[in-house]
Amino acid sequence: MNEYNRARIRLLTNQEAIDFVSAINSDGTATRYALENFDRTYRVNARSLLGVLYFTTEHNEDTYLVNDDGGSIPTSIDKFRV
């Protein structure tokens, strides 16, 4: 498995999911971000609103933002960190 960074987040409302996706997509990079559950068995593209909305309905208690490219987690999502 590639080395990557991971941060626990919480998205409780649809508006928070929309704001989160907007923040991730405004970082100006092509970095691959994903949301995954605690044991890494379920993943979605964090840049996809549909994926994020679905993921938060199924796995909201244990949601992690992952940088698959080994870089840092953008500071624009700090307000969603747990």
Question: Which residues fall in each region the model found?
Answer:
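Extended, charge-rich low-complexity interaction segments
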Residues: 69-71
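RNA-recognition motif
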Residues: 38
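Short glycine-/aliphatic-rich beta-strand segments at the starts of folded cytosolic domains
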Residues: 2-11
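Amphipathic alpha-helical interaction surfaces in cytosolic regulatory modules
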Residues: 15-33, 41-61, 73-81
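Structural preference for solvent-exposed beta-strand-turn elements
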Residues: 12, 31-35, 67
